[in-house]
Amino acid sequence: MRILLSNDDGVHAPGIQTLAKALREFADVQVVAPDRNRSGASNSLTLESSLRTFTFDNGDIAVQMGTPTDCVYLGVNALMRPRPDIVVSGINAGPNLGDDVIYSGTVAAAMEGRHLGFPALAVSLNGYQHYDTAAAVTCALLRGLSREPLRTGRILNVNVPDLPLAQVKGIRVTRCGSRHPADKVIPQEDPRGNTLYWIGPPGDKYDAGPDTDFAAVDEGYVSVTPLHVDLTAHSAHDVVSDWLDSVGVGTQW
């Protein structure tokens, strides 16, 4: 199995390094990751400047000023030859649950892999300690995919409780929960009297029902949420069409 491994925490982050070490026991792994923390970069792509790379002695590649999406795009189209069999993103430091997936560079890297035609996993740890647990879960999933490919056309967003592996209760297939919108902005004054702003923490859980990713992780289970690239709200198609007819948009301007 050939694995392109990326993240949004940066090439030296403990999550990606722990996972790379575990995966290299049974797979051919190429790390292509940002040279710095790009958390919250979502699906952003660098279009107005060129991208430089640096290759470390162990073969890991850092993309200077690159986003997670840049890294997967370059990895698939230029840097990993032969091309990968699968794209893996993580292990993220902290969860990507509910609405987090909108902003997550970890999820975006996997989405880019899926968009380019490859199976993809995004893996996050609900904390900052037991990366070995998340690595073991990821290895088990990848071995399963090697034995029997999952042909859903979706990515798997995997969130792992921050527990020793022996304390993880199992695995659940979940849906994304949701949070209250975060509205906190933290202003500060710099030494010259100018105001600068920090984005505040995420909102509290709003929808954390028993079938959500929030509930699974809180209860000690690995959460696996299938996600897809198509953002079309198919269930709203007829409602929007009827509304356009009702208000006359398209028949008169």
UniProtKB/Swiss-Prot annotation:
User: Where is it predominantly found?
Assistant: cytoplasm
Record bears the keyword Cytoplasm? yes
Which SUPFAM superfamilies did the record assign? SurE-like (SSF64167)
Q: Where does a divalent metal cation bind?
A: D8, D9, S39, N92
Copy out the cofactor comment: Binds 1 divalent metal cation per subunit.
Asked if the record carries the keyword Nucleotide-binding, the reply is yes
Reactions mediated catalytically: a ribonucleoside 5'-phosphate + H2O = a ribonucleoside + phosphate; a ribonucleoside 3'-phosphate + H2O = a ribonucleoside + phosphate; [phosphate](n) + H2O = [phosphate](n-1) + phosphate + H(+)
- Please list the GO terms describing molecular function: 3'-nucleotidase activity; 5'-nucleotidase activity; exopolyphosphatase activity; metal ion binding; nucleotide binding
Pfam families found in the cross-reference section: SurE (PF01975)
UniProt keywords (A-Z) are: Cytoplasm, Hydrolase, Metal-binding, Nucleotide-binding
Query: InterPro entries, from UniProt?
Result: SurE, SurE-like_Pase/nucleotidase, SurE-like_sf
- Which cofactors are reported in the record for this sequence? a divalent metal cation
- State the EC number(s): 3.1.3.5, 3.1.3.6, 3.6.1.11
Subcellular location per UniProt equals:
Cytoplasm
Gene Ontology cellular component list: cytoplasm
- Top EC class for this record: hydrolase
Q: List the HAMAP family hit by this protein, alphabetically.
A: SurE
User: What family name appears in the similarity comment?
Assistant: Belongs to the SurE nucleotidase family.
Q: What does this protein do?
A: Nucleotidase with a broad substrate specificity as it can dephosphorylate various ribo- and deoxyribonucleoside 5'-monophosphates and ribonucleoside 3'-monophosphates with highest affinity to 3'-AMP. Also hydrolyzes polyphosphate (exopolyphosphatase activity) with the preference for short-chain-length substrates (P20-25). Might be involved in the regulation of dNTP and NTP pools, and in the turnover of 3'-mononucleotides produced by numerous intracellular RNases (T1, T2, and F) during the degradation of various RNAs.
NCBIfam families, alphabetized: PRK00346.1-1 (NF001488), PRK00346.1-3 (NF001489), PRK00346.1-4 (NF001490), surE (TIGR00087)
Q: What protein name is recorded for this chain?
A: 5'/3'-nucleotidase SurE
User: What is the species of this protein?
Assistant: Salmonella typhimurium (strain LT2 / SGSC1412 / ATCC 700720)
